[in-house]
Swiss-Prot record:
Annotated residues for binding of acetyl-CoA: 379, 385-386, 404, 422, 439
Described function: Catalyzes the last two sequential reactions in the de novo biosynthetic pathway for UDP-N-acetylglucosamine (UDP-GlcNAc). The C-terminal domain catalyzes the transfer of acetyl group from acetyl coenzyme A to glucosamine-1-phosphate (GlcN-1-P) to produce N-acetylglucosamine-1-phosphate (GlcNAc-1-P), which is converted into UDP-GlcNAc by the transfer of uridine 5-monophosphate (from uridine 5-triphosphate), a reaction catalyzed by the N-terminal domain.
Subunit structure: Homotrimer.
UniProt signal peptide: none
Name of protein: Bifunctional protein GlmU
Length: 459
């Protein structure tokens, strides 16, 4: 039989105090909705239907082309949300997973175990449950003396006795698809919230003598539903520990994993060393035996093997093998550094390609440049690429030496093996093998300093 999935993502999330739909808030670099969608993939659903509502266009954009969408114009409860999927799923034979889009910590393994449990026990409905010493706010699982599930009771509708129950409803279920939609026709809004509860379907199945079961999570953290910023931070913390643990098991060394922030899609090879307060975001890839020191921040970039990045920022760029960056360097978007390049302290590179073995040791700005191999930039070199309206390109050949405190005004080209004298302002092309000096000639005036107030003779 086929598997189907319904993801509930219509809510506004008032307690988030945000204009962004709740399910689009990010955990470890991707939205909560994307986390849930990826985990749902473990059951290989034939159809996945996502229920949208508040700012539906934003939610649909995230999963465009990956799921079908239905709209819940009025948020009248979880049961009502599932009713919205009726035109797509009613009458199909199979098992349907119903899950909230704000549960980013649920794993694909747990969902696979849940649906296997449901099938193996021939249940018409199976509830994913968890146990906690502090069940306040959760729906409780009410069982009979034979430990069979009788019903789910919400916090606001629970008796004092029922509030003591520690087994809670996680809000995730598997149903026989055909029976689900038949039962939904019989639920009502006779409850404290005046909503259609999906949980009422469980009571209907019990009344008709059909088999209802519960599969209990091994890890309570997976049950976390995010309703406010506090829970969002908790989810981020748990996810970060999972991610870092995975990398450590795969041969990555962390000085302080609790102070290291790595997004879920980051790839790290073995033998990488990561110090504290390192952040790796987006689609970043780190090659083997690279060292990332305290304070390094890398976004959507590729760093090769054997590189050393010291307390620096790299954004949307590529860094080849053996490169040294930092401390306090900034590699801005659309830059590429060739093998063995050295970008030192207080150097900024923007939108530039730099050939292998090139060095810019300190206090340099390289913007909109095409730089060859074995180039040396002296301290204080500035490439001037912007005239207030347009940006221009500088081309620097191989084996070029640029003296300290030089200004290179684009558009200009420095030929192979050329040399720029220290302190020069370059406004014209420099031919290959030439030396360019663009500064005033030094003049010495003998004894002139004796006329000045600072001279000892005038004290």
């Amino acid at each position: 039989m086929s598997n189907f999935a319904i993801i509930l993502a219509a809510g506004k999330g008032t307690r988030m105090k945000s204009d962004l739909p709740k399910v689009l808030h990010k955990v470890a670099g991707i939205s909560m909705l994307e986390h849930v969608f990826r985990s749902v993939g473990a059951i290989q659903p034939e159809k996945t239907v996502t229920v949208v509502g508040h700012k539906a266009e934003l939610v649909e954009e995230v999963l465009a082309g990956q799921t079908e969408f239905v709209t819940q114009s009025e948020q009248l409860g979880t049961g009502h949300a599932v009713m919205m999927t009726e035109p797509i799923l009613e009458g199909l034979s199979g098992h349907t997973l119903v899950i909230a889009g704000d549960t980013p910590l649920i794993t694909g393994e747990s969902l696979k175990n849940l649906i296997d449990f449901h099938i193996n026990h021939k249940n018409v409905a199976t509830i994913l449950t968890a146990e906690t010493d502090n069940p306040f706010g959760y729906g409780r699982i009410v069982r009979n003396d034979n430990a069979e599930v009788l019903r789910i009771v919400e916090q606001k509708d629970a008796t004092d006795f029922e509030k003591q129950i520690k087994e809670i409803n996680t809000g995730t279920y598997v149903f026989d698809n055909e029976r689900l939609f038949e039962a939904l026709k019989n639920i009502n809004t006779n409850n404290a919230q005046g909503e259609y509860y999906i949980t009422d379907v469980i009571g209907i199945f019990r009344e008709t003598g059909e088999k209802v079961g519960a599969y209990t999570l091994k890890d309570f953290d997976e049950s976390l539903g995010v309703n406010d910023r506090v829970a969002l931070a908790t989810a981020e913390s748990v996810m970060r520990r999972r991610i870092n643990h995975k990398h450590m098991v795969n041969g990555v060394s962390f000085v302080n994993p609790e102070a290291t922030y790595i997004d879920i899609d980051v790839e790290i090879a073995s033998e990488v060393q990561i110090e504290a307060n390192v952040t790796l975001k987006g689609q970043t890839k780190i090659g083997a035996e690279t060292v990332l020191t305290n304070g390094t921040y890398v976004v959507d970039s590729t760093i090769g093997a054997g590189a050393v990045i010291t307390n620096s920022m790299i954004e949307e760029s590529s860094v080849a093998d053996g490169v040294i960056v930092g401390p306090y360097a900034h590699i801005r978007p659309n830059s590429s550094l060739g093998a063995q390049v050295h970008i030192g302290n207080f150097v900024e590179v923007k939108g530039s390609s730099i050939g292998e073995n090139t060095k810019a040791g300190h206090l340099t700005y390289i913007g909109n440049c095409e730089v060859g191999s074995n180039v040396n930039f002296g301290a204080g070199t500035i490439t001037v690429n912007y005239d207030g309206k347009n940006k221009y390109k500088t081309v620097i050949g191989n084996n070029v030496f640029v003296g300290s405190n030089s200004t290179i005004i684009a558009p200009v080209e420095l030929g192979d093996n050329s040399l720029v004298g220290a302190g020069s302002t370059i406004t014209k092309d420099v031919p290959a093998d030439a030396i360019a000096i663009g500064r005033g000639r030094q003049i010495n005036k003998d004894e002139y300093a004796t006329r000045l107030p600072h001279h000892p003779k005038n004290q």
